Structure formats: C-alpha cells, structure tokens
Regions:
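Thiol/disulfide oxidoreductase modules built on the thioredoxin-like
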Residues: 106-113, 120-164
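Alpha/beta-hydrolase fold active-site loops
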Residues: 58-59, 90, 135, 145
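N-terminal "domain-start" segment that seeds a small globular fold
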Residues: 23-51
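Positively charged n-region of N-terminal signal peptides that target proteins for export
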Residues: 1-4
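Short pre-active-site segment immediately N-terminal to redox-active cysteine/selenocysteine motifs
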Residues: 57-59, 63-67, 133
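Thiol-based oxidoreductase modules, predominantly thioredoxin-like and allied folds used
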Residues: 89-101, 115-122
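Conserved redox-active cysteine motifs that mediate thiol-disulfide chemistry
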Residues: 63-80
Length: 175
C-alpha cells in the first residue's frame, strides 16, 4: 500500500511539473495569477528603479522594441493613456527588448514618449513576463500579481479599451 501511494504521489508530482513546463512560454515566466519577482529596471528616459517601486497602484507594462512595427504603432496611444491618467489610477511603463540602448533611446526621443521606459538587455523581464512575441501588454494589480496579458497592438486610449482596462483593474475610469 505504501508503494502504491508513493507511486501515485510521484506520478502526480511529475505530471504537474511537466505540464507546467510544457506550457510555459518563456523560461521563468510568471503566469496569470502569479506575482512578479523583484528585479532592477534599467532606466531609458529616467532613473533606474526596482520593480517594487511601482507596487501600491495597478500597473500596465508594455513590452516593445524600436524595430517592431506594431509596437511603434501603439506607442502614441500608450503615451496618451499615461498622460490622461497621469499615474492617478494606474501607472504605465515600457520595457524595451532592443539589443542596443541607443536604438531604444532614439525611438523614445523621436516619438516624444514621456512615460517611464526601461531596457531589458539581460532578458530577465522578457522571460518573466512571457514576451516571446511583442508587443505584449501586461496588467498587474497593486500587489504585483499578473491579472492579464494581451498580445498585439491596440489603441489603448480608445473608449472601449479604457473601459476594458477599468474592468481588469476593477476601477471606474472616466473616458
């Protein structure tokens, strides 16, 4: 009987580990409902910060690269969203996956982006966020728990998307 329970436990344990690994998009990815791990963010248009700096308020993280056409297309709408809510209801940050800092900073300057952007040259955040495709936008609650991940470019400041953001964060946003 002992051998049966031991075999059952090991089989269940291995099945759960293998299924988790098989469906992970990137190594070390934090899935929906998981909590982001602490890491230092390398500032592109401002100071470097620890990820925990943004705790206490919902957070929208957009993963992008200067060479990515869809990323470039949605960046202006993210800027308008960030300016409209000005960190009052939530914060917006960008994570560049560019290989070269100068490419990312040139894009930020060219487009006039003012919300905080960081460089992920060691791919820690790209892996943690599951950014195997970009653009990727992640919604994180005030405690650092991942609520939703959306792949693809969107007009984030549209009335429909503002309403959807409010629903994800369980807050009422004015259009």
């Amino acid at each position: 009987m002992r051998i049966f329970f031991l075999t059952f436990f090991l089989t269940f344990f291995l099945a759960s580990v293998l299924s988790t690994t098989a469906f992970a998009g990137t190594p070390g990815e934090v899935g929906i409902g998981g909590y982001l791990r602490e890491t230092t963010l390398d500032g592109l248009n401002g100071s470097s910060r620890k990820l925990s700096y943004f705790k206490g308020k919902p957070l929208i993280i957009n993963v992008w690269a200067s060479w990515c056409g869809p990323c470039r297309a949605e960046m202006a709408s993210l800027e308008r969203l960030a300016q409209r809510y000005n960190g009052n209801e939530f914060n917006v940050i960008g994570i560049s996956t560019d290989d070269y800092r100068n490419k990312a900073t040139a894009f930020i300057k060219q487009t006039g982006i003012t919300f905080a952007n960081f460089l992920d040259h060691r791919l820690l955040l790209e892996n943690m966020l599951g950014a195997n495709t970009i653009p990727l936008t992640i919604f994180v609650d005030a405690d650092g728990r991942v609520l939703k991940k959306i792949r693809g470019a969107y007009a984030w400041d549209s009335p429909e998307n503002i309403e959807a953001i409010g629903e994800v964060f369980h807050i009422k946003l004015k259009h």
